[in-house]
């Protein structure tokens, strides 16, 4: 059963060491170039089954087979903006959300690396997967998208969380 707690709590600490009980989804943003090595990725890389290496493999192969939770259905997930790779790691399901491209300059203005349309699609995919599980506990998240990716946490990310993940308990970890 999905936990309909409808609350967002902020904590200080390492999101990969979240102490909440039960199955936790850990969504974070990855880029569409297969490059990772800073921020929360450094902690996720040390987790069981190395979700970051799985992301790099997904990038190299350009697709992977993902079993849809709670079903026998297997779907090919192509590596592109807006897609999510789900990697089980102990009590976590790490969600590698492809929502970032290099910064660009358009009409002499810097465009942030984050692609909010892609992040929205990723977050919707995460919500769909959560709803298929009856042992889901909560989402434990870093402040994704608001540092190197260039989004404003309060203006850009929080409204997406409140809209798409409104039915779930969410713990935001600030490191």
Describe the residue ranges of each PLM region.
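Macrodomain-like recognition of ADP-ribose-binding/processing modules
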Residues: 1-175
């Amino acid at each position: 059963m999905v936990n309909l707690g409808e609350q967002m709590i902020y904590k200080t600490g390492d999101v990969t060491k979240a102490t909440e009980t039960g199955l936790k989804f850990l969504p974070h943003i990855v880029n569409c170039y297969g490059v990772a090595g800073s921020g929360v990725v450094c902690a996720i890389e040390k987790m069981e089954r190395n979700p970051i290496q799985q992301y790099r493999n997904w990038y190299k192969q350009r697709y992977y087979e993902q079993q849809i939770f709670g079903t026998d259905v297997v779907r090919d997930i192509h590596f592109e903006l807006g897609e999510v790779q789900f990697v089980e790691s102990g009590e976590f399901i790490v969600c590698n959300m492809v929502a970032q491209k290099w910064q660009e300059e358009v009409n002499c203005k810097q465009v942030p690396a984050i692609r909010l349309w892609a992040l929205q699609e990723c977050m919707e995919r995460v919500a769909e997967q959560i709803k298929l599980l009856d042992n889901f506990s909560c989402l434990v998240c870093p402040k994704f998208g608001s540092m190197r990716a260039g989004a404003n946490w309060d203006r850009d990310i929080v409204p997406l969380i409140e809209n798409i993940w409104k039915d779930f308990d969410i713990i935001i970890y600030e490191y």
